[in-house]
Amino acid sequence: MSTATPAQNKSNDSIRYAIEAKYHFGIVVPHHTSMAYLINDYARGGEINIIRQRYKKDLWESYLNRPETGIGMWFSTFGRPDIYGEGIAIYPYINFRIFEWQKLSARYRVALGLGYASNPFDYEKNTYNTVFGSKLNAYVGFGVLLRYPIGNYFSLTSSFSLNHMSNGSSRKPNNGINTATLTFGAVYELNQFQEPTYHNTSPPPSKAREILATISAG
């Protein structure tokens, strides 16, 4: 399958940088019965992301349709501040292109990082919190994003996001928490940038020999 990679000239050796800020509003998904009774508010928060998009030739991004990569910070309430507290996460992420139609573009995001829960389970002070057994947690985020430029430096952005935090049962209790949110925000371009011209090409063929065998029964 062919993918778009930059034409081989000096103008393509460039990197785009931008900063993105978004507001989150949504729900905490009550995947345990106790959570359904305790949650009494929406999930609210935000995120800030540093965006990098590389156009240098012979990079892995060239064969994946030039995805955006970067580092971000996410913050959210969890529907019951006195029990579940709030969460903060720092993560690297990658945004893959889905389609582009005129000025509108769509991407999907995968993020994985470290999360912090402000009010975990405590035998004396917070026995209702069966979601977080520790302050340190893993963070996983997925999203589908839309973006529309309004000038040379600004773009409007919106997305549907799924966010998860848990400690992987390294410390009990650990039901983990999931939020489903809609986001609205803006992107500001940090450098004046024009996307290079691309030719269709394919990744170089692998010289390694590959053997695949499967066995099934029943």
Predicted regions mapped to residue ranges:
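Repeated loop/turn-to-beta-strand initiation elements of outer-membrane beta-barrel proteins
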Residues: K57-W60, Q102-A106, I150-L156, Q192-E195
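Gram-negative (and chloroplast) outer-membrane scaffold detector with strong preference
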Residues: R66-Y116
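Extracellular loop and loop/strand-boundary signature of outer-membrane beta-barrel proteins
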Residues: T33-A36, F78-P81, N126-F132, N167-N174
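Residue-level signature of outer-membrane beta-barrel architecture
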Residues: R52-R54, F96-I98, L146-Y148, Y188-L190
